[in-house]
């Protein structure tokens, strides 16, 4: 029995007729000028992008469009029943960029290092202005440059700027303090105010912790003890003065031995 060959099914989407490999392979048999070969590779790459957009459901890019009929030999590869879809293309892929003679004659101004930041910002604006004057559609690089954050809108990282510390000034002597409590205690030296009074001997103090240390005098408890000699004290500052005596004695002993 002879095998019957079935006709090839008609593709659902016209762009599925062409693949990167088959498209370029078909062009090997056609007389295509050498200058149009990069355009064919660009068409193949953009065809793959269009295929992914169609299959995945992504919206198409709203960019300047041009037909592939300008590329020689494209219309002969596609069946006449299907219409060649238009893909987003950039003009430089089909037509080479032509430099205007006016721009080539202009000389670039000398860079001024004194105004570095100003010159950098002006250079970007000049580039955008030149593109608008030429009338050429914006490229992807130009669109990305426009969407970049300006230095003013960049999010700040790291610590916030430190707040200025408040200064509390004594109205009697003009001394500065960083805390209001320290200023309050200092001003009591000028006014001789002693709001904390002992209940036993009625001695008054400027600070509450001084009154607390004073109360140990009336009791037998001496919580502050010297580690050198074991002597106890009622106040911490009295113990600190006592420790200086031990350090002075240690400094005098080596000097006596040398003599």
Swiss-Prot record:
Alphabetized UniProt keyword annotations: Developmental protein, Metal-binding, Nucleus, Repeat, Repressor, Transcription, Transcription regulation, Zinc, Zinc-finger
Protein location: Nucleus
Any one Gene Ontology cellular component term annotated for this protein: nucleus
Protein's organism: Xenopus tropicalis
Gene that produces this protein: osr1
Gene inactivation effect: Embryos show a down-regulation of early pronephric markers lhx1/lim1 and pax8, and disruption of pronephric development.
Name by which UniProt lists this protein: Protein odd-skipped-related 1
Function: Transcriptional repressor. Required for pronephric kidney development.
Repressor recorded as keyword: yes
GO biological process: angioblast cell differentiation; intermediate mesoderm development; mesendoderm development; negative regulation of DNA-templated transcription; negative regulation of transcription by RNA polymerase II; pectoral fin development; podocyte development; pronephric distal tubule development
Principal cellular location given in the protein's record: nucleus
Family membership noted in the UniProt record: Belongs to the Odd C2H2-type zinc-finger protein family.
C2H2-type zinc-finger residues: 168-190, 196-218, 224-246
Gene Ontology MF terms: zinc ion binding
Lineage: Eukaryota, Metazoa, Chordata, Craniata, Vertebrata
Keyword rRNA-binding applies: no
